Design a protein with these regions (language model features):
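TRNA-recognition modules of translation machinery and tRNA-sensing kinases, especially anticodon-binding
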Residues: 1-177
């Protein structure tokens, strides 16, 4: 029997691996120069995290998650995106209320029909800037937003990307401590 990589999940070898490494090193150098800290999260999280953050009625949660039950009958999912795990890590490590700028880079997984430009395993880079909006001035919030935008535009320039769409989301998290 001959083994192959799973459908929609490709190996990176040779020149392709070198190209990915070059792009990643340029991105990492830039985000570090802006003062962002790296966050590495597990590939798997409890499914409830994605249901709550992405939405339990979304296609990502209902159709595209790679999920399984562990030996304790807990539903576990392989990450389909990075934000949920990063925010969970910052909250769990008590870094969410201090104002922090972080970046992440890594493989994400979605069970969808592979097609041009869309695979089941893909690399995602993201920056997250957490700040206490109640304790921060409007000026601080604008400065934080401009820092994120400036960093992302510099990445686009360094990578010589001509045709791009920049999407920015502002999520206000409300929660109480136990």
């Amino acid at each position: 029997m001959k083994y192959k990589s799973l459908r929609g999940m490709n190996d990176l070898v040779g020149d392709q691996a070198k190209k990915y490494s070059l792009v990643e090193s340029k991105i990492i150098s830039l985000v570090n120069s802006y003062g962002f800290d790296e966050v590495r999260t597990p590939l798997a999280e409890v499914t409830e995290l994605f249901e709550r953050s992405i939405g339990s009625s979304t296609d990502i949660v209902n159709k595209e998650l790679y999920s399984f039950e562990d030996r304790n009958n807990k539903s576990i999912s392989i990450r389909p995106e990075g934000t949920a795990g990063v925010v969970r890590a910052l909250i769990e490590n008590d870094l969410d209320r201090h104002g922090i700028d972080v970046w992440y880079l890594g493989p994400m997984y979605r069970y969808e029909r592979p097609q041009k430009g869309r695979l089941r395993q893909f690399q995602q880079f993201g920056v997250e800037s957490l700040i206490d909006q109640e304790k921060s001035s409007q000026e601080e919030l604008i400065r934080m937003e401009l820092k994120v935008i400036g960093c992302l535009l510099d990445i686009v320039e360094v990578l010589n990307i001509k045709d791009f769409k920049l999407e920015i989301n502002n999520i206000c998290l409300l929660y109480t401590s136990d």
